[in-house]
Amino acid sequence: KRARNTLISLARAKGIDAQGTDMLIGTAGRFEWKNKGIDVFLEAMRRLGEKAKGKKQVVAFVMIPYLDREDFTMGNVHVVFVPTYLNGNDGVLNLPYYDLLIGLDLTVFPSYYEPWGYTPLESMAFHVPTITTSLSGYGVWCEEQGCTTIDKGVAVIYRNDSNTNDVINHIVNTIEYYLSLTPRKVAAARKAAVELALKAEWKNFFAYYREAYSIALKKASARL
C-alpha cells in the first residue's frame, strides 16, 4: 500500500488527479531508446489515450535514469517520467525500485533486443503481470512454458524488424483487455505471474548450467 500511495502522490504532485482506483503501469531499465522498447512504450501510451477516452484513468511511470522528458497526457492516460536511480535516496520517492514495483498493476517491457530480461521476470515475481516480446530470452522461455497471454501473468508479443506498429497496437489491446478484467480474474493473473516466475529460480536452472559447463570442459579437454 505504501508503494501505491507513493506513486499516486507523485502523480498528484505533477498535477494529475490520481485516485487509488486508477490503473498504474510502469516500465523501467537502462536508457536504451530502441533496445528497451522505450519508443514503443511511449507510442503505445499515446494510442491507448486516444482509444480509451472516457474509460478508467491510467497513470504510466517511466522509471528510467537520465530519460528526462516532459510528462504528457492523452485522454485518460498520463505519462510520468522518473529520470533517476531508484535506490531509496532520490529525494522524491525515496523508495528502492523493488519497493515501488509492488505498487503497480501492470508492467510493459517491449524489448527489441534482450538476451534474457530480468525486469519482466522480477515484475512477475512481485505479483505484477507483465508484457514483453519474443525478442527477449525471457519471453522465449515463457512461450516454451505455454504462457503468452496476460491471463497467465505474461503477454509475449511477437516482434521483428518490421512489425513495430503491430507491436504497439498489441500492447494497447492487451492493456485494454486487462482493464476489462474482473477483480477475480486480475487476482488469478497475478497468481499465475508469480507461479511462472518461481519456475525461473536459479535452483531450477542450475542443472542446465552444470550440463553446459560439463560440455565446455569436455570440448576444452579435447583440444589439449
Task: Describe each PLM feature range.
Residues 1-224:
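Catalytic cores of carbohydrate-active enzymes across secretory and cytosolic contexts
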